[in-house]
Amino acid sequence: MAKKTVAKIKKKSKNIPNGVAHIHSTFNNTIVAITDVDGKVVSWKSGGTSGFKGTKKGTPFAAQIAAEQAAQIAMENGMRKVEVKVKGPGSGREACIRSLQAAGLEVTKITDVTPVPHNGCRPPKRRRV
């Protein structure tokens, strides 16, 4: 029995001039999601999807590569200006912002949206190494 060929639908590139880059940086990984102004995701990458495994996902270099790849896809969709919202205490925060600028996106505003507890949950205990 012959296999049926399925026609692949090619994605049309949209023209989105402005957007928002959401950087979620934890100690273990960094996730970069670039959305349009309404919040619809245009592209996203993380340390893991960029080819890093284990503890290397949390490094600034992994965050830099993830931001470059996400910015490349966003620029293919016509994005030129981006507003950056950074969340979390990780090491890839600054590396992501620098990488977005180096990729050719114009950063208009940088906002820190890290959630701060008003004495909510008990934090994890200190590591003894």
Swiss-Prot record:
Pfam families: Ribosomal_S11
UniProt keyword Repressor, yes or no: no
A GO term from the CC aspect: cytosolic small ribosomal subunit
Family note: Belongs to the universal ribosomal protein uS11 family.
Subunit structure of this chain's protein: Part of the 30S ribosomal subunit. Interacts with proteins S7 and S18. Binds to IF-3.
Biological function: Located on the platform of the 30S subunit, it bridges several disparate RNA helices of the 16S rRNA. Forms part of the Shine-Dalgarno cleft in the 70S ribosome.
Entry protein name: Small ribosomal subunit protein uS11
